Every structure is written in C-alpha cells, then in structure tokens.
C-alpha cells in the first residue's frame, strides 16, 4: 500500500480536462522535484510548475485548465499551494510566508466547474487537518470543515454539491463524511461500530461514493456506498487487497488496482459496461489517476527488470502505452525478477522477495532489507529511490526483502499485529528471516548485512542489537532508536497517531524502554553507516544522534552523514545521489571488498 496515496489521497500524476496532456512530478530538470507536462500519448516534457528551493510533492488539474501543485521546502512536508494557467506563469495559491502551515492536496481536489480547490490545512491548530476551499480566480480561502481530527479531501460529487472527506483515526481505521460544499450539512456516512478502513476514491454518477474498505472482510475490497443510508454494493472483493482506485469527475468511469502477492492487476469499468482488466506483466502500480471524462487513465508502473515508467491507458480500447520513462544504471539484460519465498516463522510464514545476482559463483554476500512504515509493503520492483538496490545485486550481493508482520497487502490481521508491539512480533520475524539466511548455502553466512530506512532503520537497529554476531555491517537511514524520545519529540500533527501505533508514554513506558534499540546499543559489534535529514518531521534527528553518540563513546566504527536541506527522504537529486552512492559503496566495501 502506498501511504501518501492511501491516507492523503495525493498523486504525482494528473490529466488535463481534455485528457490530452499529462502532468508528472519529476526531478528530471534542475535536480529537485517539479511538475512537468507532456502529451498523454508521449512526447517531450516541459516544465510547468517549479518553485525555487521547494520540491513539488503532488498535483491536480482543474476543469478551468489550471494545474495546482503542492510543494515544500527542505523536506519539512509543510506544503504550500501554487497554481498555473496554461497561458501564464505559476503563482502562489495558498501560501504561508512563515512556512509553518501544512497542506494536503488530493488528486481530485478541484471542483467540477473549475472554480474551487478543496484541501486540508492545519492553519487553525497544528494537531488537526481542517478542510479549506480556495477560489482559483480570486485566491479567497475559507474553512469548510473544522474539528479535532485529521481530515483529507476524497473528491467532489459530479454535480459539485458535495465533498467526500476521510477522517483518519489510525492506519487501519478511517471514517467518511459527506459535506455540503456550500458549508451546510455534515453527514456521517460510515457508522463505525468497530475498526474499519474506509478510503475514498471519488463519486459515481448515481450519487454513491466509490470506496476501498475492509468492512466485514480480512482484505480490502472495492464498493459503492450509498451516503444517505450506509448501504454497500460490492464491486470487487478479491482474495487480495484492492490497493488503489479512482473515479472520473463525471462519475461514469472508475479504475482500480489489485495487489496479488505484490504484483498489480488493473481493472476498470466505463458506463456500466463489463469490467475489463490488464495485468502489468510482473509490474507494480504505484500511482493511478483517471481523466475527468473517464476516457484515459494514467499510472506509474514499476518493475524489477525495467525502469520507472508512466503509462496511459485508453479505457475504451484497452490500449496502453508508455508516455514517459526513466533509466537504470544497471544494464537491462543483467536485471532479474525476484523469487517469492515464504519463510516459516512462529507467528506465520513471512512472504519475502529474494534477488539473486546473475552468474554467481559460490556463496555470495546478502543484505536483509526491511521496508519502512512499518505499515507499508516491499514490492517486487525498484522504485525511483530504490534503483541503488539493483546496483547491489549487479555487484554480486543478494537481497532478501521480507514483508514481516505490520506490512500491508496481506490482510488486516497481518498489518495490525505491529500496533503497540514494536520490538515484539517484528523482532521474532526478523530472527526467523536472519536464521533462514544463515542456513542458505547460496549465501555466505560470514558476509551478511542489514539495511533499512525509517521503520526499516528501527528494524536494522533491532537486528544489530539483538543478533549482533550475525552481521558484517549495517546501514540505518533516519531510523527510530528510542521509542520514548520518538514519542516525546514527535511533531504535534503526528502525536495523535503515534500512541496507537507505538504505545502510550505513561502506561507503556517500561515496555517502550525495554523495546528500544538504544537500550541495548552496547551490543552492536559491526561497523555502521547512518544517514539523516536535518529537517526530518517524522523521525527527528535526535534519534540518529543518540545512536552515533553512544557508538562513538563505545569505540565502535560508525560513519554519520546529516543532510541539512532534507527531511524524511531525499528530494534533492544531488543529496539522493550522494546518499545512495554512499550506501552502495559502504556495503560493497564491507561485503565484497574494494
């Protein structure tokens, strides 16, 4: 599951009102993320929206022809909104000069008449996200829905009278509201008697909401929800998760993606016709949008053997084509699809993708790569920021990429098992995967490493503190080290979620201390590389500082690099190249030799 799309409804893609032009967020120009436009059938991209010293994160296109973009500075995730008409320059739309306000721009934020854009803002209170409306012509902004909650825009009804809004309570619990766009009635659409996920995907022409939900099921399914009565009609309830969905602005078409053991399958309907589908040939759908009239879809396709690509799909004919592609540093013929392995473990078999170097002779070194989140999923593909992993395989290093408990894509129970159990069920899974790696004759047990970022950094620190003799080296990228200080130092907009995800500072303090890797940091034996963004709003820099200070005090070998203009990830290409280059060189040096 893709967190930014699922819980913020954001997209790095947009289609113009006539479906002829595609907007894409890319760092292809000056080395930072900007909005580019190109013909939907493919062609030369042109810069559309770029903001000095800012990185564009998401876009949407209004019926008036204006392209709206959200951009932040220095990785702070405090997005400002900008707009550009095709005949003019980009201009500020909703901007806080002090840069203290966070905004979320959904892919379907523009009203059907092209006059208004709805977005989330914490201008009133740093802990909450209210729904605001801004007039594209005048720039006039006003709040539409306020309250002590995190609200995310989920789309306008085709007649422009109502807004669908998601109220995020936890990663596995969301409610839906239907708002009168003029500022009147607020209807509670989902009457939550128990924890249920409800992720909006827009409106249908008959006035029902298109929703991804796990109501009554273990896996996420796609349904049509009557907002007045709460009655459901199932559209697609496969034995796998529905991961992404989008309805056209006119409600006459919709498209969705099903996650089948990590691989994606697209399905769509137009004007009540039969469902059509398209497999992505070993690929993964990372982003998905639909034009206002439903005639064309755009999606990002990822693969383990091909570079990042943007595709467009004609929903009438089913014809799909590549509109934009990037490149791999590793030659195409040297890339290979991973094998899906299920590793036995006490709490259930762990799905794991294993990448093996081509033409390997003898036992090879291997890297364990736990993903971030933890409520996310490693897919059988290399995204834009994971191509360096392909470089490791190219250099003769195997990759073992597990989806341990807490991962999405395998049902609600698997995902929610991590709640308030960081350092518990996940550590048991990591032990099982590590032991499996040590038993494989194809891997050199004396040359194993662990590398992860964000929650994956926490998992890395668990591994090196609880299984210190297993690792030749380790890489921690903005990982959580101390569960207590993580909760104490969290930004206000994250605090309401962290107590449900990690634990309560007062009630669970003893367990949090015991489960924190920093408590056992003296157990670390292997050399480490640690990378951190100075402005990280999710995992504060203090987390990495603690680890580095303690390791250096113990005389351990540790390399530490802080990027002053980055946050939770890398939005500047020069920084990304430096960081991923350091990771590849460090792991190659320690596992293979110079």
PLM features: residue spans?
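Peripheral, non-catalytic segments that deliver or gate enzyme domains
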Residues: 1-364, 374-395, 422, 436-439
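Serine-hydrolase catalytic core recognition
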Residues: 289-296, 300-594
């Amino acid at each position: 599951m893709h967190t930014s799309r699922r819980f913020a409804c954001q997209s790095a893609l947009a289609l113009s009102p006539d479906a002829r032009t595609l907007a894409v967020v890319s760092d292809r120009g000056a080395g930072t993320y900007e909005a580019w436009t190109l013909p939907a059938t493919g062609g030369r991209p042109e810069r559309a929206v770029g903001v000095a010293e800012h990185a564009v994160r998401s876009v949407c296109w209004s019926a008036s022809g204006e392209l709206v973009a959200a951009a932040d500075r220095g990785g702070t995730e405090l997005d400002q909104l900008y707009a550009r008409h095709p005949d003019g320059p980009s201009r500020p739309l909703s901007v806080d000069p002090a840069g203290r306000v966070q905004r979320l721009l959904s892919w379907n934020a523009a009203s059907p008449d092209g006059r208004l854009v709805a977005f989330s803002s914490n201008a009133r209170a740093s802990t909450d996200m209210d729904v605001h409306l801004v007039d594209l012509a005048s720039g006039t902004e006003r709040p539409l829905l306020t309250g002590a909650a995190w609200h995310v825009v989920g789309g306008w009804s085709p007649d422009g009278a109502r807004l669908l809004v998601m109220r995020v309570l936890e990663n596995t619990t969301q409610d839906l509201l239907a708002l009168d766009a003029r500022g009147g009635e607020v209807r509670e659409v989902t009457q939550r008697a128990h924890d249920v996920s409800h992720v909006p995907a827009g409106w249908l022409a008959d006035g029902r909401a298109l929703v991804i939900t796990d109501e009554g099921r273990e896996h996420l399914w796609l349904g049509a929800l009557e907002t007045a009565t709460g009655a459901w009609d199932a559209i697609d309830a496969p034995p796998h998760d529905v991961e992404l969905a989008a309805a056209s602005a006119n409600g006459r078409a919709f498209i969705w993606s099903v996650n089948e053991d990590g691989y994606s399958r697209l399905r769509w309907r137009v004007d009540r016709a039969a469902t059509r589908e398209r497999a992505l040939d070993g690929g993964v759908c990372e982003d998905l949008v639909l034009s206002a009239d439903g005639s064309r879809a755009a999606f990002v396709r990822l693969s383990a053997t091909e570079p990042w690509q943007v595709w467009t799909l004609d929903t009438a004919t089913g014809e799909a084509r590549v509109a934009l592609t990037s490149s791999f540093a590793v030659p195409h013929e040297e890339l290979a699809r991973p094998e899906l392995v299920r590793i036995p473990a006490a709490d259930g078999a762990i799905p794991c993708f294993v990448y093996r170097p081509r033409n390997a002779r003898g036992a090879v070194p291997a890297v364990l790569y736990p993903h971030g989140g933890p409520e996310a999923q490693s897919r059988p593909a290399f995204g834009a920021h994971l191509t360096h992993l392909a470089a490791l395989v190219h250099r003769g290093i195997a990759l073992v990429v597990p989806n341990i408990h807490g991962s999405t894509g395998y049902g609600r129970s698997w995902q929610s098992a991590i709640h308030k159990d960081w350092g518990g069920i996940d550590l048991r899974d990591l032990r099982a995967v590590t032991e499996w790696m040590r038993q494989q004759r194809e891997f050199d047990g004396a040359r194993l490493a662990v590398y992860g970022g964000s929650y994956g950094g926490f998992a890395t620190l668990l591994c090196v503190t609880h299984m210190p003799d297993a690792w030749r080296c380790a890489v921690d990228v903005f990982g959580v080290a101390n569960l207590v200080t993580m909760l104490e130092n969290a930004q206000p907009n994250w605090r309401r979620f962290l107590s449900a995800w990690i634990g309560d500072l007062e009630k669970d303090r003893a367990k949090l201390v015991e489960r924190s890797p920093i408590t056992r940091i003296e157990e670390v034996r292997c050399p480490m590389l640690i990378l951190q963004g100075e402005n990280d709003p999710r995992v504060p820099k203090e987390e990495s500082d603690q680890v580095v200070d303690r390791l250096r005090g113990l005389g351990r070998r540790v390399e530490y690099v802080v990027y002053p203009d980055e946050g939770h990830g890398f939005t500047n290409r020069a920084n990304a190249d430096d960081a991923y280059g350091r990771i590849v060189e460090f792991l190659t040096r320690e596992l293979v030799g110079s």
